[in-house]
From Swiss-Prot:
Domain EF-hand: 9-44, 49-84
GO molecular function per UniProt: actin filament binding; calcium ion binding
Protein name (Swiss-Prot/TrEMBL): Plastin-2
Protein species of origin: Danio rerio (Zebrafish)
UniProt keyword Chaperone, yes or no: no
């Protein structure tokens, strides 16, 4: 893998550049995206030269000639060709996209430039303005003016970010923990800690973003984080266990399992094509070049608009006469006027449609789907409904943890997306277990024998776990990972997460070996010094009330816990959950990156309880 020869700092730059070109975020760069990049960059080059450069980039980067450039291919070639004319032109294009504002970086290296998309800023500002327009706690910064830099100052106190996180994943942050009045630099810092650690807990990749970056309104970091939060909210219901009507998208000869494997982006594309097919119109392959003429959008709007066939829902007729408009921009504007009648004009301008901005068009379609899916759950199909299971809390915690570390591709379905072990290898690297990437088969896999390639990866992943990581993997074989055996996959993931957590403590404690007893001892010493009660271990029944966790937070940061908000006696499950929500949010607020959920405390789940105390111990040790 390219990682072996490239410094961490350069790797981060390459990752940022890749993300800028891979605008639909699907983990690879297509020719469409290269064309869009050079068109938007507006470089002073004749058209034939741009075409030659794109061909050269495709030829040299697409190492296996499958029409897709993966991050590994991208990193290797950009690194190897650093001084070539093609690579220089490519980098220039990345930095000069029209509608992309370049901002001098703050690192010591001269010449560091970061950029952000003006179109994205406008889209996100309008979305946040609408989402929070009635929230009394945000009136001091809303509405923001999309034509200015309002957004970058508005996020500076953390309140807007906390609110947006709660809109995307309700109940992530306990409102009682957000500092809202008479803000000081210290209480602002707490809000930003709370926002960042909560974003991490819902699966945002925030490893390189600090509270200071948000306070100072670093544009590319603010937009990057906000997009992740918005996208998680938009995609929340594009998932079969939460929306069984999606089964209408099953094609002939497909099983339910085939549909479950699709990512939210793939499901959205299939949904769009389902409605286009119903309308007797040509299908689309993407939300960039194929939607530029707005015709597909017109037909989808016409299909999903209410027709007065459901009781109590008034019809909203769509005027599609604008589809005959000769000018692309005018046609797009007419189409958006019709979308506005459905209350679905968000995220794109007519220009964004005509330019085929993949990220904003994806958001536009996701929002349309959420409001008007226009799908009916099939009545007579022979479907095993019991096989549609939503993910458990434990599975969601592991998935969010992995995604917060920036694994690529993003994990949407725990077992399906680990079947080739690529994500597991990345997690091994995060816990300092060396991976020989020459032994790893990388996608795209051949049509014939693809599962054998994935199985070889899984066998190597288990071998690494046993020999290098010294994990207890008795009875676990590569086949179990490849086939998505729940119990055995979770056993490996737990050991990865545990080692990751303990490594943080060992790094803070000069490499001293940390075991469960070390954490319990530290917790009890800290509680005793603060005059508070102790615990017997991670199964202690008192943890169900969350009081030991709250007491520890108050011992680490004296005076931080408002005990008047808590219930300590006659505890019902509801009161316990209320305490636990407050405890988890307070842990994040004082700077602990906690992934566990409130229910884990109420039910005293020892594994997740251990991670809560370990993260608090890491936060406590940082005071020294």
């Amino acid at each position: 893998m390219a990682a072996a020869q490239i410094s961490a700092e350069e790797m981060e730059e390459l990752r940022e550049a890749f993300t800028k070109v891979d605008v639909d975020g699907n983990g690879h760069i297509s020719t469409d995206e290269l064309n869009a990049l050079f068109k938007a960059a507006n470089l002073p080059l004749p058209g034939y030269r741009v075409r030659e450069i794109i061909q050269e980039i495709s030829r040299t980067m697409d190492l296996n000639q499958d029409g897709k450039i993966t991050f590994d291919e991208f990193a290797k070639v950009v690194h190897d060709l650093k001084s070539s004319e093609v690579a220089k032109t490519f980098r220039k294009a990345i930095n000069k996209k029209e509608g992309i504002c370049s901002v001098a970086g703050t690192s010591e290296q001269s010449g560091t430039q970061h950029s952000y998309s003006e179109e994205e800023k406008v889209a996100f500002v309008n979305w946040v303005n609408k989402a929070l327009e009635k929230d009394p706690d945000c009136q001091h910064v809303l509405p923001m003016d999309p034509s200015t830099d309002d957004l970058f100052t508005a996020v500076g106190d953390g309140i807007v970010l906390c609110k947006m996180i709660n809109l995307s994943v309700p109940d992530t942050i306990d409102e009682r923990t957000i500092n809202k009045k008479k803000l000081t630099p210290f209480t602002i810092q707490e809000n930003l800690n709370l926002a960042l650690n909560s974003a991490s807990a819902i699966g945002c990749h925030v490893v390189n973003i600090g509270a200071e970056d948000l306070k100072e309104g670093r544009q590319h970091l603010v937009l990057g984080l906000l997009w992740q939060v918005i996208k998680i909210g938009l995609f929340a219901d594009i998932e079969i266990s939460r929306n069984e009507a999606l089964i209408a998208l099953l094609r002939d000869g497909e099983s339910l399992e085939d549909l479950v494997k699709l990512s939210p982006e793939e499901l959205l594309l299939r949904w769009a094509n389902y409605h286009l097919e119903e309308a007797g119109c040509p299908k689309i392959n993407n939300f960039s070049s194929d939607i530029k003429d707005s015709k597909a959008y017109y037909n989808i709007l016409n299909q999903v608009a209410p027709k007065r066939d459901e009781e109590g829902i008034p019809a909203i007729p769509i005027d599609i006469s604008g589809i005959r408009e000769k000018d692309d921009l005018k046609r797009a504007e007419c189409m958006l006027e019709q979308a506005d009648r459905l209350g679905c004009r968000q995220f794109v301008t007519a220009t964004d449609v005509v330019r085929g901005n993949p990220k904003l068009n994806l958001a536009y379609v996701a929002n349309l789907f959420n409001k008007y899916p226009a799908l009916k759950k099939p009545e007579n199909q022979d479907i095993d409904w019991s096989s549609i299971e939503g993910e458990t809390r434990e599975e969601r915690t592991f998935r969010n943890w992995m995604n917060s570390l920036g694994v690529n591709p993003r994990v949407n379905h725990l077992y399906v997306d680990l079947a080739d072990a690529l994500v597991i290898f990345q997690l091994y690297e995060k816990i300092k277990v060396p991976v020989d990437w020459d032994k790893v088969n990388k996608p795209p896999y051949p049509k014939l024998g693809s599962n054998m390639k994935k199985l070889e990866n899984c066998n190597y992943a288990v071998e690494l776990g046993k020999k290098e990581a010294k994990f207890s993997l008795v009875g676990i074989a590569g086949q179990d990972l490849n086939e998505g055996n729940r119990t055995l996959t979770l056993a490996l993931l737990w050991q990865l997460m545990r080692r990751y957590t303990l490594n943080i403590l060992e790094d803070l404690g000069d490499g001293q070996k940390i075991i469960d007893e070390t954490i319990v001892q530290w917790v009890n010493e800290t509680l005793t010094q603060a005059g508070k009660g102790t615990i017997s271990g991670f199964k202690d029944g008192s943890i169900s009330s969350s009081m030991p966790v709250l007491d520890l937070i108050d011992a680490i940061q004296p005076g931080s816990i408002r005990y008047d908000l808590l219930k300590a006696e006659d505890l019902t499950d509801e009161k316990k959950l209320n305490n636990a929500k407050y405890a988890i949010s307070m842990a994040r607020k004082i700077g602990a990156r906690v992934y566990a959920l409130p229910e884990d405390l109420v039910e005293v789940k020892p594994k997740m309880v251990m991670t809560v105390f370990a993260c608090l111990m890491a936060r406590g040790m940082r005071r020294i």
